């Protein structure tokens, strides 16, 4: 149900991820995963209400960094949270295994307490809801402009109000172009007739 604490849980990648989580919210100074995405539910009733969500037990890095973060913040009041997190991650990597051991033991104790308090606990990260993509008024005008350009290739493929306007514009263009085409088609015939009559007059 719970993993045994080992060196893999405190690899540089995991430490960097935890340190980045620290920089997201001030509440992370005292908890390991205080963000809404890292809150978990208990395995008792499967509900996900505010009372049922349980935070993960702190790991060794969080146990060590909660005091170190406050110390660094007091010494460097102008330093951003992200910079503090990077510094803490680097400092943690520089510690020896002997220096990290007390924090590993404390993390194990916290895990045991957490397991006793929430025996059916399961870590279930909350998924972010996808935002529905809606067309804004500006997007609609852009779509109409694009249809106006591409209407010769895709005249009736759109199924919104712009399609009707596009179709009416095309029909009006066709109606205007037909007399012009007829007149232009008659020009060569009239031209040939005039040349024929002129040649006939010269022969006679």
UniProtKB/Swiss-Prot annotation:
It is found in: Nucleus speckle; Cytoplasm; Nucleus. Residues 175-187, 194-204 have a biased composition (Polar residues). The keyword Manganese does not apply. Residues 32-52, 169-204 are annotated as: Disordered. Its main location: nucleus. The keyword DNA-binding applies. GO terms for molecular function: calmodulin binding; DNA-binding transcription activator activity, RNA polymerase II-specific; RNA polymerase II cis-regulatory region sequence-specific DNA binding. It comes from the Eukaryota. Transcriptional regulator that controls a genetic switch in male development. It is necessary and sufficient for initiating male sex determination by directing the development of supporting cell precursors (pre-Sertoli cells) as Sertoli rather than granulosa cells. Involved in different aspects of gene regulation including promoter activation or repression. Binds to the DNA consensus sequence 5'-[AT]AACAA[AT]-3'. SRY HMG box recognizes DNA by partial intercalation in the minor groove and promotes DNA bending. Also involved in pre-mRNA splicing. Interacts with CALM, EP300, HDAC3, KPNB1, ZNF208 isoform KRAB-O, PARP1, SLC9A3R2 and WT1. The interaction with EP300 modulates its DNA-binding activity. The interaction with KPNB1 is sensitive to dissociation by Ran in the GTP-bound form. Interaction with PARP1 impaired its DNA-binding activity. This is Sex-determining region Y protein.
């Amino acid at each position: 149900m719970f993993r045994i604490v080992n060196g893999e849980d405190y690899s540089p990648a995991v430490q960097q991820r935890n340190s980045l989580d620290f920089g997201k919210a001030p509440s992370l100074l005292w908890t390991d995963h205080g963000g809404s995405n890292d809150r978990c539910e208990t395995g008792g009733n499967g509900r996900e209400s505010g009372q049922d969500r349980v935070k993960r037990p702190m790991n060794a890095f969080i146990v060590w960094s909660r005091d170190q973060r406050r110390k660094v913040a007091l010494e460097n009041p102008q330093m951003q949270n992200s910079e503090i997190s990077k510094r803490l991650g680097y400092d943690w990597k520089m510690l020896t295994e002997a220096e990290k051991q007390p924090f590993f033991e404390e993390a194990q104790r916290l895990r045991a307490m957490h397991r006793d308090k929430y025996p059916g606990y399961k870590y279930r990260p909350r998924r972010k809801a996808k935002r529905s993509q809606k067309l804004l008024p500006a997007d609609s005008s852009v779509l109409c402009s694009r249809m106006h350009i591409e209407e010769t290739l895709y005249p009736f493929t759109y199924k919104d109000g712009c399609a009707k306007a596009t179709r009416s514009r095309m029909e009006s263009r066709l109606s205007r172009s037909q007399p012009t085409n007829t007149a232009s088609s008659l020009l060569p015939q009239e031209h040939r007739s005039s040349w024929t009559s002129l040649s006939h007059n010269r022969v006679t």
